[in-house]
Every structure is written in C-alpha cells, then in structure tokens.
C-alpha cells in the first residue's frame, strides 16, 4: 500500500495557509482552497503587470492637467521637453506637477520656448 507521507501533508498545509482569510469552503476544503489559491496567484501576477500601466496612465493624466493650466497640451509639453533636451521621466514630472507647481511652470515655459524656436 502506498503511503503519501509528510510531503503531501506539507503541501496541503501550505495551500491551506495561503488560503487563510478566504470565505467559506475556500479556506477549509483543500480542493476548493487549491483552486482559489491558483486563481489568486494568477490574478496577482496579471495585476502586477497591469499596475505599471495604470500608474503610467495616472502620471500622464496629472501631467496633462498641469500642462493645460499653463497653456500647453500634454503632447506639446512632452515634445517641447524633448526638443529642449530635458530628460525627466513621467513619474518625476507628475510629482512636480502635484507638489512643486512653480518648478513645473518653469519647465512648461522652457518647453514653450523650445517649440517656438523649432
């Protein structure tokens, strides 16, 4: 007769530990817990990738709003920054737009000058 032994118990214990906090049978029954943990890990993997897209979209929205307050659209602002040789990423630009409006306004002016010169 085959004995499943400690490794099987260890695996089940690990799955049930990962399922802690789930509702109903999903944290008590090994079969349901295993299925839910598998889905949860897939969702976590997918959403780690998605989070990067969402943050970039948020940064672009913030930059666009601040640039429009200073008389430029987002695309014109980014184009002006590239032409003037300023290489700041969108995360830093969005932070400046929210926390340091004076510095951001100076960047917009620099971008405007670069657009007019070109």
Swiss-Prot record:
SUPFAM superfamilies tied to this protein: Ribosomal protein L20
Record InterPro entries: Ribosomal_bL20 (IPR005813), RIBOSOMAL_L20_CS (IPR049946), Ribosomal_protein_bL20_C (IPR035566)
GO cellular component term of the entry, any: ribonucleoprotein complex
GO MF entries: rRNA binding; structural constituent of ribosome
Pfam families recorded: Ribosomal_L20
GO BP annotations, alphabetical order: ribosomal large subunit assembly; translation
Keyword set, alphabetical order: Ribonucleoprotein, Ribosomal protein, RNA-binding, rRNA-binding
Family membership: Belongs to the bacterial ribosomal protein bL20 family.
Function as written in the Swiss-Prot or TrEMBL entry: Binds directly to 23S ribosomal RNA and is necessary for the in vitro assembly process of the 50S ribosomal subunit. It is not involved in the protein synthesizing functions of that subunit.
Database matches in NCBIfam families: rplT_bact (TIGR01032)
Protein name: Large ribosomal subunit protein bL20
Native organism: Sulfurihydrogenibium sp. (strain YO3AOP1)
Organismal lineage: Bacteria, Pseudomonadati, Aquificota, Aquificia, Aquificales
Gene symbol of the encoding locus: rplT
């Amino acid at each position: 007769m085959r004995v499943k032994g400690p490794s099987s118990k260890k695996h089940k214990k690990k799955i049930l530990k990962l399922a802690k906090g789930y509702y109903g049978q999903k944290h008590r029954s090994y079969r349901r817990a295993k299925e839910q943990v598998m889905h949860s890990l897939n969702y976590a993997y997918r959403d780690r990738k998605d989070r990067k897209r969402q943050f970039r979209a948020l940064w672009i929205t913030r930059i666009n709003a601040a640039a429009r307050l200073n008389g430029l659209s987002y695309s014109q602002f980014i184009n002006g920054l590239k032409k003037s040789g300023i290489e700041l990423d969108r995360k830093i630009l969005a932070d400046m737009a929210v926390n340091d409006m004076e510095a951001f306004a100076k960047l917009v002016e620099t971008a405007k000058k670069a657009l007019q010169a070109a």
